[in-house]
Amino acid sequence: MTSRPETKIPDEITSPYPIIGAGTIESGFGRGSAELGIPTANIPVTSELNKLETGIYYGWCRLVPRNQECAAKQRSDGKKVYFNNGTKLADDELETFPMAMSIGWNPFYNNETKTAEVHIIHKFRENFYGADLRYAVMGHIRPELNYTTKEALIADINKDIEITKDALSKPSYEKYRTKI
């Protein structure tokens, strides 16, 4: 594993941030929750996200339910996933929350496609596959790394989450909470 570089969060937001966007939540591989205990919401890699270096980013996000028929869909591993389009989200789950976003290939899992995986720093009661996720990427934490153990990967993700919370507590970042 390449060693984790030190993360320095600037007091003020610097270009190219913020990057404001949205995407509809897709089913992923089911690893975030099941294997790592850190659920993620997968969204399409937009042209704006694709311009960023692979790595881990911090920012704000919020879920927006979609008025669409609910349906079960089959994931790439054969498991059926229920898309409720966010219609089961409670009012307190529609607020803006901090997020840590991974953009890249997930070398630990040898992914063949580039993904954008968002860990929303909030405990949700229901899944929300099919909902829209609006986001503001506020900055970069670190490059994408490979790991020799799942435990090392989990430890680094948890560190990313703490860095995200600390960064977004700065006044210059906090003001963007209401802009998405």
Swiss-Prot record:
Record's catalysed reaction(s): riboflavin + ATP = FMN + ADP + H(+)
Pfam family, one: Flavokinase
One annotated GO biological process: FMN biosynthetic process
Keyword Metal-binding: yes
Cofactor note: Zinc or magnesium.
Broad enzyme group: transferase
Domain of life: Eukaryota
Needed cofactors: Zn(2+); Mg(2+)
Active-site residue numbers: 117
Gene Ontology MF: a single term: metal ion binding
Binding site for Mg(2+): 40, 42
Pathways per UniProt: Cofactor biosynthesis; FMN biosynthesis; FMN from riboflavin (ATP route): step 1/1
InterPro entries xrefs: Riboflavin_kinase (IPR023468), Riboflavin_kinase_bac/euk (IPR015865), Riboflavin_kinase_dom_sf (IPR023465)
Protein keywords: ATP-binding, Flavoprotein, FMN, Kinase, Magnesium, Metal-binding, Nucleotide-binding, Transferase, Zinc
Keyword Cytoplasm recorded: no
EC number: 2.7.1.26
GO CC annotation: mitochondrion
Family of this protein: Belongs to the flavokinase family.
Function according to Swiss-Prot or TrEMBL: Catalyzes the phosphorylation of riboflavin (vitamin B2) to form flavin mononucleotide (FMN) coenzyme.
Protein name as it appears in the record: Riboflavin kinase
